[in-house]
Amino acid sequence: MTLTVKGQATRGRILDATASYLRSDAPGDITLDDIRALTGTSKGQLFHYFPGGKEELLLAAIRREADHVIGDQQPQLDDLTDRRGWERWSAAVVARYRELGAHCPLAALMDQASAPGAAEVISALLADWRSRLTRGIRAMQDAGEARSDADAATVAASVIAGIQGGVQVLRATGETDTLEASLALHLEYLSR
């Protein structure tokens, strides 16, 4: 569907409101009436931009949140070629999650994993994220800045698990110390 500038803005507003709702403290089961109230749009507009209704809207919002998980880490995520690059990326990750607190895209995605189509979006996100981290670890290994005996893909998976765990602790406590510790320990392991 080709949209006018105004149509793109309306669709974007609907997606932003849905994503914001998904990141709220207890989103529960969102309804189209909830989205209408948040956006000031009519049911007709919702179905114009999302003919598949609630399922299509939620999946589009989930895709947007997945894009934010990677986008929020740029450009540092794609510059993991040395220790300083990893330190900059780690600092950016911690700063972003500290800013977002419990209302982060990663947590919202995991909370919606059972929504139709969400598992595929989350799997693709995690594969992309792991691939980028793996490339960074291999670049460090090639430069002699990371231990050569480390399996880059396995360490990348562990980094993601550490971030996810740190985010869950952040959601419960409001503190980033677990996230910071996980990132620091992974870098220390690679640097041995």
Name each model-derived stretch.
Residues 13, 88, 92, 108, ...:
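Amphipathic alpha-helical interaction segments
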Residues 96-99, 139, 159-177, 189-192:
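Amphipathic C-terminal alpha-helical segment
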Residues 1-9:
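N-terminal intrinsically disordered/low-complexity leader segments
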Residues 70, 84, 103, 117-143, ...:
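Amphipathic alpha-helical packing segments from all-alpha helical-bundle domains
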Residues 13, 17, 21-60:
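Helix-turn-helix
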Residues 71-102, 152-159:
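Hydrophobic alpha-helical connector segments
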